[in-house]
Curated annotation (Swiss-Prot):
It comes from Escherichia coli (strain K12). This is Elongation factor P. Involved in peptide bond synthesis. Alleviates ribosome stalling that occurs when 3 or more consecutive Pro residues or the sequence PPG is present in a protein, possibly by augmenting the peptidyl transferase activity of the ribosome. Beta-lysylation at Lys-34 is required for alleviation. The Pro codons and their context do not affect activity; only consecutive Pro residues (not another amino acid) are affected by EF-P. HAMAP family: EF_P. InterPro entries: Elong-fact-P_C, NA-bd_OB-fold, Rib_uL2_dom2, Transl_elong_fac_P/YeiP, Transl_elong_KOW-like, Transl_elong_P/YeiP_cen, Transl_elong_P/YeiP_CS, Transl_elongation_fac_P. Changing residue 31 to A: No lysylation. Belongs to the elongation factor P family. GO terms for biological process: negative regulation of translational frameshifting; peptide biosynthetic process; rescue of stalled ribosome; translational elongation. Keywords: Cytoplasm, Elongation factor, Hydroxylation, Protein biosynthesis. Changing residue 33 to K: No lysylation. Loss of in vivo EF-P function for cell growth. Changing residue 34 to A: No lysylation and loss of EF-P activity. No facilitation of translation of poly-Pro stretches. Binds 30S, 50S and 70S ribosomes, possibly near the A site, note that T.thermophilus structures show binding between the P and E sites (PDB 3HUW and 3HUY). Proportionally less EF-P binds to larger polysomes, suggesting it has a role early in translation. It is present in 1 copy per 10 ribosomes. The lineage of its organism: Bacteria, Pseudomonadati, Pseudomonadota, Gammaproteobacteria, Enterobacterales. Is beta-lysylated on the epsilon-amino group of Lys-34 by the combined action of EpmA and EpmB, and then hydroxylated on the C5 position of the same residue by EpmC. Lysylation is critical for the stimulatory effect of EF-P on peptide-bond formation. The lysylation moiety would extend toward the peptidyltransferase center and stabilize the terminal 3-CCA end of the tRNA. The hydroxylation of the C5 position on Lys-34 would allow additional potential stabilizing hydrogen-bond interactions with the P-tRNA. GO terms for cellular component: cytoplasm; cytosol.
């Protein structure tokens, strides 16, 4: 892989540090009046998702990570693994609970997901930004109860719990932002 110097770090770049892949989320190059220039970089560890801030001297470098993002279709969960398929080659790939993380509650059959591979193994799964799910349990709302900014918890068909407006009822389908886990709108 290519070698990147600290002044080449940009958001989205994937590099290797301490034998693990990291994604650059933000980078600020600083040239102080006195002393050597440096880069202040915010990184996300791809194996665990934890965020780290590091400082690199202008002469520091890092290897590019051999990480591939693939668009795959979610097929099913067998209890231990989540199975995905490449729509072009029909090749199937299995991801474990560590790679799925908290995203399992947003996975729907036939949903297009971004699966990140490192050394041919899935290390993270990103669901679609928005999903449409049915409400299976929530407190009943009262007619005309639309005032105020309050909400109520609602359990969705995948088991996820989302705060919804008071007028939303059981059986309705809602649109949810998977990045924040927030209610967006009702689906007609």
């Amino acid at each position: 892989m290519a070698t990147y110097y600290s002044n080449d770090f940009r958001a989205g770049l994937k590099i290797m540090l301490d034998g693990e892949p990291y994604a650059v989320e933000a980078s600020e190059f600083v040239k102080p009046g006195k002393g050597q220039a440096f880069a202040r970089v915010k990184l996300r560890r791809l194996l665990t998702g934890t965020r780290v801030e590091k400082t690199f001297k202008s002469t520091d470098s890092a290897e590019g990570a051999d990480v591939v993002d693939m668009n795959l279709t979610y097929l099913y969960n067998d209890g231990e693994f989540w199975h995905f398929m490449n729509n072009e080659t029909f090749e199937q790939l299995s991801a474990d609970a560590k790679a799925i993380g908290d995203n399992a509650k947003w996975l729907l059959d036939q949903a297009e997901c971004i699966v990140t591979l490192w050394n041919g193994q899935p290390i993270s799964v990103t669901p679609p930004n928005f999903v449409e799910l049915e409400i299976v349990d929530t407190d009943p709302g009262l007619k005309g109860d639309t005032a105020g900014t309050g909400g109520k918890p609602a359990t969705l068909s995948t088991g996820a719990v989302v705060k919804v407006p008071l007028f939303v009822q059981i059986g309705e389908v809602i649109k949810v932002d998977t990045r924040s886990g927030e209610y967006v709108s009702r689906v007609k």
